[in-house]
Amino acid sequence: MLYFPIKGAKPIYKKENPMTRIETTFATLKSQNKKALIPYVMAGDPNPSNFVGLLHDLVKHGADMIEVGLPFSDPMADGPVVALAGERALAAGTSTRDALKMVAEFRQKDTQTPIILMGYLNPVEIIGYDNFVGLCEQSGVDGILMVDLPPAEAGSFTRHLTEHSMNEIFLLSPTTLPDRREQVLTHCGGYIYYVSLKGVTGSATLDTNDVATQVQAIKAETDLPVCVGFGIRDATSAKAIGAHADGIIVGSALVQNFADIDANDTAAVANAQQKIMAKMDELRTALDSLSA
């Protein structure tokens, strides 16, 4: 299949493989007039033994696909909530390879829900592009977003991903310069991740009118789905953004429930996960009300 992210543009790399799970999921959602709910969680948080179960619970409570953060010691784009989640995961001994093993375990029971890895380039470079992408394919990863890899410098990495039928996802923000914006729209696959706020994850102020304007402008330039993250915390913001975007990405509002708990306290972990699932139910209901 050939895929043309930019309207009327030619693909940089010829893609003859079937649709990815991400592409298939968005096609299904579009046919059902539904919006994608994409939770973000940090691999190994609150502890490695609970993480795979957390992924399955997210699906049961309405996740259409899941972004899994790769723990890193210097997460420049992460706000305090997500950064602390990474610290907890690292303290528990979770490495990039461990994260991939968790995805592989998830895949033993779930072969449908797309998994997108979100992280930073340094751990990937240590493993090596080819080895990393091979491990991702073996584990059942569907897409990768490297926060600090500009599209103009992603050629080799992009080729590896394309050869293995995985989507490479990039960020667009209110401050993205025109040249960078064009590069993102040219190279991106799966979906556009639009950062709704100026700042790091978990920032507080969300201007839904501005987001709506920006999303509409992006949609005029690409056929890719546009999903919005940063600042979505509740049903009100989910519904306001979901009315214009193809999906919403929610991280800090979920991950914050693992803050300040004892990761070895089974009851505390279970209680935190119940709060996360209650939030998922709230967000799912809000999005589904848009197509009711």
Label every PLM stretch briefly.
Residues 19, 214-222, 233-239, 243-292:
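Alpha/beta catalytic cores of nucleotide-metabolism and tRNA/nucleoside-modifying enzymes
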Residues 49-56, 176-185, 232-248:
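Catalytic cores of alpha/beta
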Residues 20-24, 28, 74-82, 94-103, ...:
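Active-site-adjacent beta->alpha loops and helix N-cap segments on the catalytic face
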Residues 37-41, 66-68, 115-119, 144-146, ...:
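Hydrophobic faces of well-ordered beta-strands that scaffold small-molecule active sites
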Residues 17-38, 103-108, 291:
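N-terminal amphipathic alpha-helix/helix-capping segment at the start of soluble metabolic enzymes
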Residues 66-73, 143-145, 150, 194-202, ...:
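Glycine-rich phosphate-binding active-site loops on the catalytic face of alpha/beta enzymes
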Residues 81-116, 159-169, 173, 211-226, ...:
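Alpha-helix-loop-beta-strand connector modules within alpha/beta enzyme cores
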Residues 45-48, 66-96, 196-203, 258-259:
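Glycine-rich, proline-tolerant flexible connector loops at the mouths of alpha/beta enzymes
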